[in-house]
A protein has these predicted regions:
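N-terminal nucleic-acid engagement/recognition segments and initiation subdomains in replication
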Residues: 1-124, 143, 375-376, 380, ...
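P-loop NTPase catalytic core of nucleic-acid-dependent motor ATPases
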Residues: 98-208
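AAA+/SF3 P-loop NTPase mechanochemical coupling elements
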Residues: 203-208, 243-261
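Conserved AAA+/SF3 P-loop NTPase catalytic/coupling segment centered on the Walker-B
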Residues: 212-234, 269-274
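Conserved catalytic/switch belt of AAA+ P-loop NTPases
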Residues: 227-247
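A short helix-turn-beta junction within AAA+ P-loop NTPase domains corresponding to the substrate/partner-engaging
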Residues: 270-288
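Conserved alpha/beta core segments of nucleic-acid transaction machinery
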Residues: 313-357
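DNA-recognition alpha helix
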Residues: 362-374
Length: 445
């Protein structure tokens, strides 16, 4: 079948329709299809929008319309037109024909937009967040925004592809963070900030038809439990959902990416294992070159060229939807600036800085570093110490085979990577084994 057959005159179409034995027009899907494919008004008018998962009317068809999506009022006009012009009155057959012709005339508005951008050769991704929001113009900020843009492009062209990163813009109220995400979506209907609950059975409806989705309220009230829920939500590649008028549920691959905004600096709950899905960028509106709404047309033109630049990278295929190993290490350190202070890690680090031995165990750290001399650690407290040593403390290497500790028996633990020497005053040795010389110390020569 070809949904885009050359239009014919109404009389030619009528002459080609199937008829009943009595000479009347047959109420068949085939006849309805012929009309939608060949009628000069309706040919090419109905299409399936891959982004919204809906049928659209994409050209004028003789009556005023407010949006492209096919709605109940449109159906009434179409039924009237087919009845008066061709004598076709079976609503179910007409609806089935609309479904077929739309399915054979698919389009994706974001793909069409991206494919028609032409880059002028001027680099903008590297400087965009500095330009609009006053962020640092460093490699991290560049890689963060580039990764987010490529993730958005990939989700448009390859729905459901693995991309579980959230770009988080952090800074004072009024900086333009939410506006940045809205303009980044190009069209307002491709943007949403209406995602409130992640466990809603109808969450697909909140994602449907949108490309850039901002999470603001959830990030503002995030705690350890909700962050885990957000992580799990970001890792999904599809929703399974049954549209009300359909019979069976279907997989709905994701075509959107998620951005976060927060006015609070310490918006990430303490997580020593890392929050690799969250990429925070600090913004300083007083350092911005322009406010993003100062000249909205100019801002949109800048963003359009930025998408064109990102498409050049996408077409080249020379990218990964993940940070490099070096940037991952930087991210892990950088994220600590956006978490509450880890007081227990600080106490353990202070203890180890003065400790002169070459190995420690978790029980020792519980009693001596965390000041529980007369208590026995619970299992969760041991796990917490292990996590601190493995994730937050440098220069100590874990050993899995138990060794003998004079006060704690045989224990697994950690050994110093660069053991201190035994000479001099042990309490004042530095991490590399040297003794710091103060002004009060008398030199022995």
């Amino acid at each position: 079948m070809n949904a885009m057959q050359p239009p014919q005159s109404i009389e030619e179409i009528k002459a080609g329709l199937e008829t009943t034995e009595k000479g009347g027009v047959r109420q068949s899907i085939r006849n309805c299809l012929t009309v939608f494919q060949c009628d000069p008004l309706l040919s090419g008018a109905i299409a399936y929008n891959i982004l919204t998962d809906r049928k659209d009317i994409i050209k004028p068809i003789g009556f005023h319309r407010e949006s492209t999506a096919l709605n109940d009022t449109d159906m009434k006009y179409l039924l009237l037109y087919l009845e008066e012009t061709y004598g076709l009155t079976n609503e179910k057959k007409i609806d089935n024909a609309i479904g077929i012709v739309a399915n054979e005339n698919k389009y994706h508005p974001i793909r069409d937009y991206l494919n028609t951008r032409v880059w002028d050769g001027t680099e903008r991704i590297r400087f965009c967040l500095r330009h609009f929001l006053g962020a640092d113009a460093d490699d991290y900020t560049y890689e963060a925004l580039k990764l987010f843009l490529l993730g958005a492009i990939s989700r448009a062209f390859q729905p459901g592809c693995k991309f579980e990163i959230m770009l988080c813009l952090v800074g004072g109220q009024g900086a333009g963070k939410s506006t940045f995400f809205r303009l980044l979506a190009v069209r307002d209907e491709w943007f949403s900030d209406d995602l409130r609950k992640l466990d809603d059975d109808n969450v697909y409806r909140k994602l449907q038809g949108h490309w850039i989705i901002e999470m603001s309220e959830m990030m503002a009230t995030a705690n350890a439990k909700s962050i885990e829920e957000i992580k799990s939500f970001l890792s999904r590649q599809k929703e399974v959902y049954k549209i009300p008028y359909e019979t069976h549920p279907a997989d709905r691959p994701r075509q959107c990416v998620f951005g976060g905004t927060s006015n609070a600096l310490d918006f990430l709950p303490l997580d020593r294992s890392g929050n690799r899905r969250f990429i925070p960028v600090m913004v300083y509106p007083e350092q911005a070159e322009v406010h993003i709404l100062e000249d909205e047309a100019a801002s949109r033109a800048y963003i359009e060229q930025m998408w064109a630049e990102a498409m050049e990278i996408y077409r080249s295929g020379r990218f990964k939807l993940a940070f490099s190993s070096a940037m991952q290490r930087y991210l892990k350190e950088h994220q600590r600036d956006f978490m509450p202070e880890d007081t227990k890690a600080g106490m353990i680090q202070a203890y180890l800085d003065k400790y002169t031995g070459s190995m420690v165990c978790s029980k020792q750290l519980y009693k001596e570093a965390l000041n529980h001399a007369f208590d026995e650690p619970k299992q969760w407290e041991i796990r917490e110490i292990n996590e601190i040593m493995n994730q937050s403390i440098d220069r100590w290497r874990y050993f899995p085979n138990p060794r003998m500790f004079s006060e704690y028996g045989r224990q697994k633990g950690w050994e110093r990577e660069n053991p201190a020497t035994d000479s001099g005053n042990p309490s004042e040795k530095t991490m590399d084994g040297f003794v710091e010389v103060t002004e009060q110390m008398e030199l022995p020569f």
